[in-house]
Amino acid sequence: MLPSRTVKNKTINHPLNECDEFLKRCVHLTQPQQDLNCILDKTINGDFWQVCQFLPHQSMDLIIADPPYNLTKSFNGTVFSKKKDNEYEEYTRQWLNAVQPLLKETGSIYVCCDWESSLIIGRVLGEFFKVRNRITWQREKGRGAKANWKNGLEDIWFATKSDNYTFNLEAVKVRKKVIAPYRVDGKPKDWIETDKGKYRDTCPSNFWDDITIPFWSMAENTAHPTQKSEKLIAKLILASSCE
């Protein structure tokens, strides 16, 4: 039985005996696929290493990866121990090697990680892809530290398979209020005037402080400690795909 909670707590949390209904909706791959038609808009339930072998090569425009952070954690009675740096580096190399053939030559990949695993992931990512940038996502959630700075960020590495890739700049521009509007011949210069004020659409930077993490009062929130918000995923999809 799940612990009681307040009415405003919307965290998604299901007991194990209710999970079967959700698992029935998932796709279970047992053989290689010629295309993505049977798994489009569906969730695949299976072993990562086996599933990668069943997916067609060069079939994906975008990969958003959120690999396990190299931390010692207990999950549902199972304890995961932190690997040595060289072991985690080899693990990273193995899973990147598994997904690299699946990405189209025009495809992009984003890899989420914490500050510590980022030191390894960024380096190994460059062995398989062309690293374009490192996005820093400010996330105000987590405990403080008595003898260290509180960690309030996560890294998202952006890489592509080639120099020919999709990046929809207009779809992800950031609208900022203009404090000192500049005019030329009486007309706005690089800004727009609306009923709600004066704004400028600027190029997005690699520091994101405009996307909050899910909290207990939000309908998308889960108990996962490093959950990525729907808006974060949507921004990546808008930028690097045609969806």
Regions found by a protein language model. Give the residues of each.
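Core catalytic lobe of class I
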Residues: M1-E243
